[in-house]
Swiss-Prot record:
Pfam families linked to this entry: TB2_DP1_HVA22
Predominant subcellular localization, coarse grouping: endoplasmic reticulum
GO cellular component labels: sarcoplasmic reticulum membrane
Protein name listed in UniProt: Receptor expression-enhancing protein 5
Classification lineage: Eukaryota, Metazoa, Chordata, Craniata, Vertebrata
Reported function: Plays an essential role in heart function and development by regulating the organization and function of the sarcoplasmic reticulum in cardiomyocytes.
Record organism: Danio rerio (Zebrafish)
Residues exposed to the Lumenal side: 52-57, 116-117
UniProt superkingdom: Eukaryota
Keyword NAD: no
Disulfide bridge partners, by residue number: none
Keywords: Endoplasmic reticulum, Membrane, Sarcoplasmic reticulum, Transmembrane, Transmembrane helix
Topological category with respect to the lipid bilayer: Multi-pass membrane protein
Amino acid sequence: MAAALKQRFDNALHEKNMVTDLLAKIEAKTGVNRSYIAYAVIAFIAIYLVIGYGASLLCNLIGFVYPAYISIKAIESPAKDDDTKWLTYWVVYGVFSVVEFFADIFLSWFPFYFLAKCAFLVWCMAPTPSNGSIMLYTRIIRPFFLKNEAKIDNVMKDLTDKAAGAADKIKDEAKKATANIMFEEKKHY
């Protein structure tokens, strides 16, 4: 198992893309194998996520930048399988963000929290057929949604109606205020 993972990692380091091109240049200049360079970068990021200033920002960038980039590429591609994969990631990311918001007061006390969060997000975006986001969606989020879909639809409709009513009220108030301002300006001329 470990040998197979190492082989997949090494194969990924030799695929043609921007990161592997940079690794190839560093490997050529230093003579250090690109897998060792990648391990060093991963170790540095892991240590930084534990003790570094701005670990929260780094973790959120890791969980956002690559998935956002790949999501845009998926939208622009003719295939729809990749769209579903990345929509699933964003649903899980959103649910995780809401849960994290409410649990943050407890989670911030754990010294390895940002490292664990980053590992979780990388697991969710892993380029495998059954990565973390797909597993969490199919086992937890989807069953919950299907069980409560009618209730959720009613709540969403109620919120939409209230938001539309509030927007109409604000629009009417803005029209009245504009009319009053124009009336006051005409009185001065």
